[in-house]
Amino acid sequence: MNSTEVDNLPFQQQLTSFVELAVAKATGSPITTLFTIIFLILSYDQLSYQINKGSIAGPRFKFYPIIGPFLESLDPKFEEYKAKWDSGELSCVSIFHKFVVIASSRDLARKILSSPKYVKPCVVDVAIKILRPTNWVFLDGKQHTDYRRSLNGLFSSKALEIYIPVQEKYMDIYLERFCKYDGPREFFPEFRELLCALSLRTFCGDYITEDQIALVADNYYRVTAALELVNFPIIIPYTKTWYGKKIADDTMKIFENCAAMAKKHINENNGTPKCVMDEWIHLMKEAREKHSEDPDSKLLVREFSNREISEAIFTFLFASQDASSSLACWLFQIVADRPDIVAKIREEQLRVRNNNPDVRLSLDLINEMTYTNNVVKESLRYRPPVLMVPYVVKKSFPVTESYTAPKGAMIIPTLYPALHDPEVYDEPDSFIPERWENASGDMYKRNWLVFGTGPHVCLGKNYVLMLFTGMLGKFVMNSDMIHHKTDLSEEIKVFATIFPKDDLILEWKKRDPLKSL
């Protein structure tokens, strides 16, 4: 290729071709050639960053050539994220080969989340390797829409009612354990174990053993640790990403075996559904037998393989484990620190149960817990577990009139600023459950980005509110929670989602639910 031909290429291809031409024509010693190549690579890296950055906020130059702020990304800090959001509605960084655009305003976040023509989820850069490229979350267009519609029945009101008994059983087991602990302890790991057990029993029922639950609960943190926002481009043996992929593969193998047992229970033994796997297989069976003309049922006529089921169930665990653990930590810390809220929850719990604390949970009962539900919603707004949702740009994306995100860039809509918008939420940095009693449209709709929006909005949003409303009510009614505050209690630690920096030091004591409030 000669210089005239190079001039006719797009700019970034010109840069690449320029390097090739320079190397081909380089003369002199090997050392001179080497330094020439290094200089050209570094120049290309900086120029590429400048072209991609355009007019949006971000460092003027890549201070650390090639790697960018990679070392900072290994230890993410909430304060640094917030500074980036405050720097402009669009900002950027560049790490290794990946150019990252961050959108901090509500409207831009909604635009990105609702633009499947231009973007698709990538979770984080390495997620496709850990969750597998065949996983349904990475499907695009009609394939994704159809697959997602086939899962809607797993989170219908009818299905949610099925899951409550096993959830309540494990709530009781863990609450009794918490109350037997001698003195205060860190509850970040305790809540991770509790939520993992609740999720696995909800998803897999009795097909998964106690030993397997313990194994997944003990090891799952390696998956979380592997899914940093930006990783080294390849998986290196015995690194965090390598261990994360191994644990993910081992867990999905357990789920495959559970799916096989669920198929036998539903298809061969005509059993009734008791967990998510049962309900999915039951819906497939029902669709085949009835030859339903309902569009959603038609999608279930085909037989989903055990592998497909295992991958989908793993995404449910992936989506729920860290976010629900985060919600549990903040929710119980916040409530334990506010005796007025505790009193209101206890009053409501006895009222909806007609003063019988032994009444078991049901969907109708949970739906009556208006105040308790408002406390959960306010916790999700005040300390949203998920700060941002990474996407990859499929083709040049005109995000604003003045900026187009380049193909291949990672683009990240952030959720936190919309949930702390003072124009929508009065005193946004205060915890006020009562704000939800007369909520405005924007509070519920345009700014309520806790579960995302658009084609990838969280499937389990009603499941989350049901689970935590029921659990908060039971735990507060039947126990006293003592929060041992430290200077770090209100500081935010980022570990995939967000947690109190001191890992939440709690002490539990059993109480008579009928005693005076």
UniProtKB/Swiss-Prot annotation:
Transmembrane segments: 21-41
Catalyzed reactions per annotation: 5-dehydroepisterol + NADPH + O2 + H(+) = ergosta-5,7,22,24(28)-tetraen-3beta-ol + NADP(+) + 2 H2O
Locations listed in the record: Endoplasmic reticulum membrane
Major location (coarse): endoplasmic reticulum
GO cellular component terms, semicolon-separated: endoplasmic reticulum; endoplasmic reticulum membrane; plasma membrane
Listed Gene3D superfamilies: Cytochrome P450
Pfam families hit by this protein: p450
One GO MF term attached to the UniProt entry: oxidoreductase activity
SUPFAM superfamilies: Cytochrome P450 (SSF48264)
tRNA processing among keywords: no
Membrane topology value: Single-pass membrane protein
Top EC group: oxidoreductase
Keyword match DNA repair: no
Needed cofactors: heme
Residues binding heme, per UniProt: C458
UniProt record, GO biological process: cellular response to starvation; ergosterol biosynthetic process; filamentous growth; filamentous growth of a population of unicellular organisms in response to biotic stimulus; filamentous growth of a population of unicellular organisms in response to starvation
Pathway entry: Steroid metabolism; ergosterol biosynthesis; ergosterol from zymosterol: step 4/5
Keywords: Endoplasmic reticulum, Heme, Iron, Lipid biosynthesis, Lipid metabolism, Membrane, Metal-binding, Monooxygenase, Oxidoreductase, Steroid biosynthesis, Steroid metabolism, Sterol biosynthesis, Sterol metabolism, Transmembrane, Transmembrane helix
EC number: 1.14.19.41
Family according to the record: Belongs to the cytochrome P450 family.
Protein name in UniProt: C-22 sterol desaturase ERG5
Organism: Candida albicans (strain SC5314 / ATCC MYA-2876)
Protein encoded by which gene: ERG5
